[in-house]
Amino acid sequence: MKKIGIIIVVLALIIGISDFAFAGSNPLKAKEKEVVNSFYAMIPDDHKIDVFKLHEVWQKAMADPAYRKKIYLIDVRSHPEFYAFHIEGTDHFHAGHMYGIPKKIKDPNAEIYVWCRTSHRSRYVAGFLYKYGYKNVYWVGPTTKNGKRYRGGVVGWAQAGFPFVNQFTGKFKIVEYRKHPSKKEMSFNIREFHPY
């Protein structure tokens, strides 16, 4: 009986280890990386910018309405992400609906800036826009400045201390961005009561 128990434990360990081994060598994950890199390669190097350059463009657009009408500042995060917070005065186009961009932006030479949470989705969108025939698309990616690493997208924008807005609170800054809340934060129960 003892031998059967040991055999079962050993088999369970072997199966568990093999699952991890196969998960690590997922050919589809490698192919996705290859595809996203092919889209990234389509973006000219001088059109790969960081949040500091985006901030300069954004400040100019906010100060000059005529310039703002000529450019497109597009956040490609999901709708809930955008509604939670976004960069003031920017446009929103969900990455999954990028096929609709040519219907809205008809000039292939339009100046277009795209970003997402960090930079992954926007790489796809920027690559697709170049495939569509746009010539002047800027992708907001990561950078290192004064020895500090900044992500691309709104995470990098928050790291740099730049402001956000939403429809509920107005303008604000995120003092610490975390993708995953702490255990303490997860322990808070928000009870919502409805009058109906």
How should these model regions be labeled?
Residues 1-4:
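Positively charged n-region of N-terminal signal peptides that target proteins for export
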Residues 65-71:
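Periplasmic peptidoglycan-binding/tethering modules of Gram-negative envelope proteins
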Residues 6-9, 66:
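Short helix-onset patch at the extreme N-terminus, typifying the N->h transition
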Residues 115-116:
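Short, surface-exposed ligand- or partner-binding patches at beta-edge/loop junctions that are enriched
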Residues 8-16:
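Bacterial N-terminal signal peptides
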Residues 20-60, 67, 80-111, 120-196:
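Rhodanese-like catalytic fold shared by cysteine-dependent sulfurtransferases
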Residues 54, 72-77:
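Short hydrophobic beta-strand that contains or immediately precedes a catalytic carboxylate
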